[in-house]
């Protein structure tokens, strides 16, 4: 009996970063923005009405606002419940062949989860010792390509020349450039979507826009790609975007000054923090994201991770090959990073 268990889908799920509930925590483990959203959010809240009704299935106002902000037509923008939702829809829509899709071995750990969930064959391509993608690995025949730029969890950034080279060698499949962290120092590949009809660029409100709690992500691509994604989305959930996300996601794009101010604060803090971390024995590649991926010359990452957690400082540790002696540290406020730095100086000095 109990034969229903034989029909349960067996998957190894994605493991999200810890969300501590206790007070007084310095939370530097999930790459959230340390600054509050723009005041435009508060002003726009009064415009959230008719919650008893379903939201606009097309999220037209939000799509139009994103399209206008980036200089594209609304038919070239797809929105979803965070970039995870956008990426999942893209996987379902474009990766349906028998050939393996390619992505880096050290990368966003949701990629293999989606591939397994949707029955997509895949191959991981090893990054080099500096955690850089080797473009030549993507020259061979495949069923699609996806990679973050900057990469997560390493922060390594590919130049647009390298990104375009990968695209040029893969014009028969869809190439997804996952730009969750692009606003912290890199050059976006969005303009390449005008040149190549197989390129999809994915971005999010969760990092640079301080709106991780609203879950807003989007993709930019040619109209045919976007229509295909909407067709898939409407086949399982036509109301993915809720009304608050549509209203507030539209409003936040109106405050460019605040966006640039907080973005630059994070970049400045990151550059200062990298200098200070090297002074106390940490090494890492220069990051173009809102985090660094660091290892210490003599103290193990796991030991630092556990001690920091006891001190109510949360960073991210990945217990997996090649990166199990590294910590991913989100860039918080200057005060938060000074507190972490003081802890690290004291802790590593005793080892």
Task: Please report, for each region that a protein language model flagged, where it lies by residue.
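N-terminal "arm"/small-domain region of PLP-dependent enzymes with the aminotransferase-like
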Residues: 1-53, 141
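Conserved PLP-anchoring active-site segment centered on the Schiff-base-forming lysine
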Residues: 93-116
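Active-site phosphate-binding strand-loop segment of PLP-dependent enzymes
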Residues: 123, 128-183
